[in-house]
């Protein structure tokens, strides 16, 4: 059963996340988080190290402040959805007690009543390799894993991910908006991989047995 837990403040919400796998953590479990590998995340989960505080990083501040505006514009662009946001809360599923989902927004498809996930990303391009992450029809691997984790926890039917991609050239700012739609029915096999990987990882946490390092593909 999926339940929603509401918190009185952001510090209380942050405290409740400890000991559980969140969306961005899921990519670390699978070795697909470019900022943290699976061993580093394991060290955090067993208390050897503390997560780095990135709340004052400029890109985090920008993304946090831009989120509500991007969500509002998405709602204007997609009248077929009811768009809702629940702050300082998390969704929990008793099938996966090791996981939580804190969403940028929740969608209801008005014609069918289907429930979906809204995920917002802001990204600034700094070079050709960074640009390649957002080229084509696929989202970066770590964000793909994140939204599949959310599908696992919520049992919702689809994801709408909106990315605002920013580039600065000669003091001129260019913004590109890209929308990505993912149907749960198309990614069930990948969700099963995430379920299995997260369960195995949490067993290693309980046993305090360090996992083998997963190296990124070259």
Report the location of each language-model feature.
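Short glycine-rich, polar/acidic loop-and-turn segments at beta strand-coil junctions
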Residues: 46-48, 66-68, 72, 87-89, ...
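Acidic-basic catalytic patches of nuclease active cores, encompassing PD-(D/E)XK
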Residues: 60-85
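Helix-loop elements that line ligand-binding/catalytic pockets
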Residues: 198-218
């Amino acid at each position: 059963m999926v339940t929603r837990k509401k918190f009185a403040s952001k510090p209380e919400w942050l405290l409740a996340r400890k000991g559980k796998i969140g969306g961005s953590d899921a990519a670390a479990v699978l070795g697909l988080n470019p900022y943290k590998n699976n061993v580093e995340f394991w060290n955090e989960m067993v208390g050897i190290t503390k997560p780095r505080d990135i709340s004052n990083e400029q890109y985090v501040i920008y993304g946090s402040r831009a989120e509500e505006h991007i969500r509002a514009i998405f709602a204007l662009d997609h009248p077929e959805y009811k768009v809702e946001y629940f702050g300082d809360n998390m969704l929990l599923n008793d099938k996966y007690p090791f996981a939580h989902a804190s969403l940028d927004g929740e969608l209801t498809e008005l014609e069918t009543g289907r429930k979906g996930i809204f995920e917002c990303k802001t990204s600034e391009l700094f070079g050709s390799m960074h640009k390649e992450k957002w080229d084509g029809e696929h989202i970066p691997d770590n964000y793909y894993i994140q939204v599949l984790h959310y599908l696992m926890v919520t049992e919702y039917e689809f994801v709408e991910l909106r990315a605002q991609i920013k580039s600065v050239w000669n003091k001129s700012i260019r913004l590109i908006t890209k929308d990505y739609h993912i149907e749960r029915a198309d990614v069930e096999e990948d969700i099963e991989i995430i379920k299995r990987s997260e369960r195995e990882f949490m067993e290693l946490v309980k046993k305090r047995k360090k996992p083998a390092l997963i190296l990124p593909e070259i």
